[in-house]
Amino acid sequence: LNSKGMLLIWSIHLRWLTWVATTSPHIHVFLSASSACSNIIPRSAWEARETHCPKMNLPAKYIVIIHTAGRTCIMSDECCLLVQDIQSLFIDRLNSCDIGYNFLVGQDGVIYEGVGWNVQGSRVPGYNDIALGIAFMGTFLGTPPNAAALEAAQNLIQCAEDKGYLIPNYLLVGHSDIVNTLSPGQALYNIIKAWPHFKH
């Protein structure tokens, strides 16, 4: 039971997700991953702090694959807490407007809304208004994310295409392709090189 009295019960599978959020009064919300867009946990579910940040210039021209570094998560309650911690890091220590990523990927195979589709992230200077940043939670220098996380990210990209958040001829790049950084980690980078639209 969290601080707002919301009980989050997650039943997660690679290709099927049911999310039941119970509040007082009793409200039930069910999300099924029958489409590429449905496996996204909204900011309200992980109790994001409210912010007002610059807007994206949509449709985006780039997908930037990032890793957050630090710890990862494999259970949904653990991932929600980790996303909270990452948001606090950005706001309180890095003086950012909000969490630096549009979306985050847990090793529970679930996508967590960061600033979402319409708001700029803050990790790719010069690209923040035209790129969607997808961050895998963890460090992936030697070991890549698991299959569930990789599939979730690919579904998210398909969702962005389906909903018109990406131009048809978008480019997919690693964080290290545009910033001097170890992100997204060599193990993850080796995988995304084989993804559609990759551009070194």
Residue ranges, per PLM feature:
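Basic/polar, cationic surfaces and motifs that engage anionic cell-wall
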Residues: 2-68, 106-122, 127-200
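Glycine-/small-residue-enriched capping loops at alpha/beta junctions
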Residues: 86, 90-99, 107
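Cysteine-centric signal of extracytoplasmic or virion-exposed proteins
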Residues: 37, 53, 73, 79-80, ...
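Active-site acidic/histidine clusters and adjacent loop/turn architecture
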Residues: 57-91
